[in-house]
């Protein structure tokens, strides 16, 4: 009973809203009716005659001055609107109407309960705007030597931008170096190698670091006669040098895996020694932190090599062990690698368990988290989903949950559906991504498109429902539905991260505002009138009088274009065309 009453109230509310939407048409007809009734007391005909007499006394110079002034004003408005649109990405007139006029006209709900929540949300969104525009390391990034360079050799295009590679160099310096590197010659060489821009110079420096370590081991081993094995452990090979060679010199994934295994032996020894000495001072603590980053990076890349080579179960085991051993290192986002590998195994129950841990309101979201959750819910209903049947009987609870999950994912990153539905071509993902941006969409779709295709009907459900998200967020830059407003900075950052041959997806689409088009048309029209009036003042004056007479006459319904030109000919007294004369011999 209560549900029926609630439904009736909702229908009544929708009817009232609909009636207010079209109330202006009723008001318009009422005004026309009042004007018709009061035409005699208001002396409308006399007033129109007076206006007509006044306009007839105007000279062509007045029209020239009027059109010239309006052209100047329209041109100034056009220039200002164009400058404001280029600088801020929106029309000034539209911005003023949305910010100031729409609240006065009742376009914003001013309930006190909503105001308190929205004010808190706005303050939080201001704090979040900086973090949302932060560039993140792509957890599924490819190998430069084995994948990016091979793409360059085949196509002749550079898949990585200088800005992206510069960010990677900064990450390497942060993860793989510390203040005490100058005490060890090999680490000092690698510290310079990470800053080197030339790839060949970096590779040469890595080989040099390995050779220096080898020479030092050969020289210092004979000095200790007691234990040769202990001395070799004291001087292990440089793990970061192997990392660089595996990333940039190896031309296949198998070669990269061999180098990473050598790096694991060296890195594991350094990690165990620094773990014992980490409490002896800040210098040893920094070394242990660096060795931890190196070890986690190596194990993660080894798991990715196993995934690339088809050993998916082995990769899943390595990722799980790594997450258990280092649970606090969330900066590598290893759970996203784990989700992708579990989807490849079609272990959807395990995927749901991982999502239950990481799809939390207190944790940062990503396209992988949101769209994987949407895929799991779509999987339950997509094989039987039909738009025609849903329109007849309505959506079931499971279908509604799937649609809401898709809307949630699309609101977080609206660029992904175009790549999943193959409406836009994919490129190699960059090494860094911007959350909610086009770069993140490419990185997600590059690895997860196959998983969506594997679930029957999932792409069909996505195709039928994803555009409905935009009806819930008509102003995504100002207010979101489930997330913070969409950040404005994504387009600029994505253009820096993605190569020039890729057309960056922009959301919301920046179409030229109507006011700019209207102003441009008005400016052009008035300028043309001014030019014609200046060149043909008498003809334009007669034409204007004829137009005024037609609009003010009682026979308005019978006018046509021929009557206009007949009046112009009568006023100018244009003589008829001479008849041709035939000469007879």
UniProtKB/Swiss-Prot annotation:
The modification Phosphoserine is found at residue 386. InterPro entries: ST7 (IPR007311). CDD domains: ST7. It comes from the Eukaryota. The keyword Phosphoprotein applies. It is a multi-pass membrane protein. Keywords: Glycoprotein, Membrane, Phosphoprotein, Transmembrane, Transmembrane helix. One of its GO terms (cellular component) is membrane. It is found in: Membrane. It holds the Pfam family ST7. The chain crosses the membrane at residues 15-35, 62-82, 512-532. Its main location: membrane. Glycans are attached at residue 47. Belongs to the ST7 family. This is Suppressor of tumorigenicity 7 protein.
